[in-house]
């Protein structure tokens, strides 16, 4: 059984400006530098006419992991994320996937960015699946909680980025 991830954030900026803060190359590099963790890197960035695709790596030091994770996984975690965005109607829709080093499973999500005037909303809706007998469900819950915390930190970064520009 998968654990759900739901996150919504609202910004006081128009759609185009918010999209650049969420998915623009400069904003992504700055976000990774500030909150990406160990060995964070933008691995690929490919604009495509009406959207963009990018892949990034983020590290989580073992000393920052919950004890439940440390008992199942030795060492630091490396998370690789891939995000695609495509213009859709009056906004953008996308998909996100992520894998965690040494953990058999995946994180998948659908994303949307919609705007009305100077108000834009970002929605992430996804799930975590871990294929480890007996403890997979517990690990899914921990990962879903950590992903939600990461999305909250990213939302704070985007809001700050928007106010500083």
Where does each model-flagged region fall?
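Hydrophobic ligand-binding cavity/cleft-lining segments
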Residues: 1-62
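Hydrophobic pocket/interface hotspot
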Residues: 18-22, 124, 158
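Beta-strand/loop substructures that line and gate deep hydrophobic ligand-binding cavities in soluble
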Residues: 52-55, 84, 92-144
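Signature of exported/secreted
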Residues: 64-68, 78-82, 113, 152, ...
